[in-house]
Amino acid sequence: MPCGPCGADFFFLVKMLCHFSFLGGEQPKRRQREVEKGVGEASGGREMAGGGEVGRKVSVAAVQFACTDVESENVATAERLIREAHKKGANIVLVQELFEGHYFCQAQRLDFFQRAKPCQGNPTIIRLQKLAKELEVVIPVSFFEEANNAHYNSVAIIDADGTDLGLYRKSHIPDGPGYQEKFYFNPGDTGFKAFKTKYATIGVGICWDQWFPECARAMVLQGAEILFYPTAIGSEPQDNNLDSREHWKRVMQGHAGANLVPLVASNRIGRETVETEHGKSTITFYGNSFIAGPTGEIVKLANDKDEEVLVAEFDLDEIKSTRHGWGIFRDRRPDLYKVLLTLDGEKS
């Protein structure tokens, strides 16, 4: 290396040019190529190429179907679609929110509390634990939970060996025409979690949770590498002209892009009518289940009418490297975010 004044100036110039190139137009393109390399067709696990390890590849699936109001039929459909996802190479399979029956929250009816079951001894969870072990897949299982005198909209996280890794209870509970969940569900008390499964550390939010960026960020801060959102969203009974499906997708695409993690959303399809205290309420569910990549791009998308199984593969090591390169977690300023702990935006 040159050591005189001229040599030092030359070295400094070269260093600055390299730095400029790193910050300029070429760098985002390189990052985008890195992310795109992390998305592919399903296979799962680590693979060897030319004798070397190429990354931790995980295949995820979202399934969607129309629910009847017969629990056994819906659980059988969920199992059939999970098996189909497994045949397509999926390691983690997401089924929609409260898939055991119709979305009963359209009405406020005391008899619907009979649908709630404890987590322990829950026949649907036990059945899907056996399936998870048989297929070696991870299954987040949505269900209406009874816990003594409390009731929750919950997900049990079943690992690939059938182990129940624990619960997440829905934190944000909506209350509006057709979506009267506050009548049935206590606000969740688990907090946001990251679950370490055989294939990846995952975060799971439930439906209305998906509208809150704090939920996604909290899970990723705890190490979640993929976000999952079981959902029940459709038309608004009070306004037939209101269609939020594109807004719904864009919000979650933002979570994926802001946190540089893949995201999986599973929604039901079909038209469901529920007897209410004042007559009937009907919702047509949007479907549009999707899988987003770590820059927010949709890589798989279902329509609004058909039963579907979506599968996509991601290289989590590649994505992790890209996430580090962007520095979004390095440059966070938690000391400035105290206002997020308030409702009115006023610092105490």
Predicted feature locations:
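Cys-nucleophile CN-hydrolase/nitrilase-fold catalytic domain and related Cys-dependent amidase chemistry
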Residues: 2-3, 71, 80-171, 176, ...
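Beta-strand-turn-beta hairpins that frame and shape the catalytic cleft
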Residues: 51-60, 194-203, 226
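Short, glycine-anchored, charge-dense loop/turn motifs used at functional sites
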Residues: 60, 157-165, 290-299
